[in-house]
Amino acid sequence: MRLVVCLVFLASFALVCQGGAQRGGFTGPIPRPPPHGRPPLGPICNACYRLSFSDVRICCNFLGKCCHLVKG
């Protein structure tokens, strides 16, 4: 009987943890800011740097100036 109660408790705890991870708002890795020694290359590259990875890739394909910020 104690084993069943323990297993039910562990299963419910696991479900609560999974639900919290799904609603936690985690959006992926935080992008690194550009190094301080390098001056900003312009408003277009700065805007590309703040976009999602897929949008940055699209921006780099059309505006080749942003690609080196993504590779860092």
Curated annotation (Swiss-Prot):
Pfam family, one: Penaeidin
Protein keywords: Amidation, Antibiotic, Antimicrobial, Chitin-binding, Disulfide bond, Fungicide, Pyrrolidone carboxylic acid, Signal
InterPro entries associated with the record: Penaeidin (IPR009226)
Leader sequence residues: 1-21
GO annotation, biological process: defense response to bacterium; defense response to fungus; killing of cells of another organism
Residue positions where Lysine amide is found in the record: 71
Any single Gene Ontology cellular-component annotation: cytoplasm
Subcellular location per the Swiss-Prot or TrEMBL entry: Cytoplasmic granule
Pyrrolidone carboxylic acid found at: 22
Disulfide linkage: 45-59, 48-66, 60-67
Transmembrane segments: none
GO molecular function: chitin binding
Family: Belongs to the penaeidin family.
Job of this protein: Antibacterial and antifungal activity. Presents chitin-binding activity.
Protein name per its UniProtKB record: Penaeidin-2d
